[in-house]
Amino acid sequence: MGRAMIEVMYEAPDDRLAELVSSFYRLDFIGDRFAELERADRAQFRFQLEGSGEYHFADGHVSPTYPVTIIGPTSAPMTAKADCALSVFGWGMHSAGWAALMGDEGAAYIDRAFDARQIFGDWIMRVRNELIAAAEFADQIEIGCLAAENIFRFKASAPFKFTSKVDAWLAGDSDPDVDVLAGVTGLSQRQLERMTKRHYGMPPKKLARKYRALRAAQLLAHGDSLDDTGLGLAFYDQSHLIREVKQFTGLTPGQLRAGESELTRATMDGRRALGSKVSRLISES
């Protein structure tokens, strides 16, 4: 039996979708057993083009991979499992995109996945059929762009102003201070907590910890120094760094350096390669 192989391709959205979609991607797996960690992440919209499996969330909940699956923001790593070859096309969603898709219902799907047919019915299956027929990633992106333009049902009421301030706060400091965010937004601590829980899946302090850990994980996986970016001062000591990175990626710094999760490494490589075409929150985490 040959060695199992994972390939992940990424592409940035065009200007029409840049405020809603973080990146497009396709994952292809050749093998008969897939069990890979996915770190805590933003919401996802995924088309299962080949194969099927399960998502195992950190709290023990298990969800099947539907033909088209919507996954809410995750606050901790989950494990994707399958016993067959896979091909998955999808896109990540900025927090404004998640709000534009789900409206006030988004908070119910933090660390959860559900069948996109619940919202979009047979239409989304026709999109899936087009993606399967297209085969080439570039052609699938064109189809995906057209589909994505039609899924954001609540775009008019999406909190673009608020999420842009939160994203800038997260990207602008290696250890973001919640008081700074309160000052920028003009919101009370209670209002901030309610808004970030609704749109990001967690309160602001934990959100800052999540992206601090993911940025550190990206550097560690590539053998870079945390001290060169200021992240070295963002953790109390080595044990604090290990705990935080493992909480949000499922892996220790040593495991990241060793490339023990092939999917995690492929994801980090793909996002980093997008560079300036996407937000630093994407390319640096």
Q: At which residue positions do the language-model features occur?
A:
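A secondary-structure capping/hinge motif
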Residues: T196-M202, E244-Q255
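Pre-recognition alpha-helix immediately N-terminal to the DNA-recognition helix
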Residues: S164-K165, A208, R212-R215
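Long, low-complexity intrinsically disordered regions
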Residues: D179, E193-R198, M202-A208
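Residue-level "edge-of-site" marker
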Residues: M195, K210, R243, G259
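Contiguous, well-ordered alpha-helical segments that form the cores/surfaces of helical PPI scaffolds
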Residues: R194, L214-Q218
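Alpha-helical bundle regulatory/interaction domains
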Residues: M1-K165, W169-D179, V184-Q189, M202-P203, ...
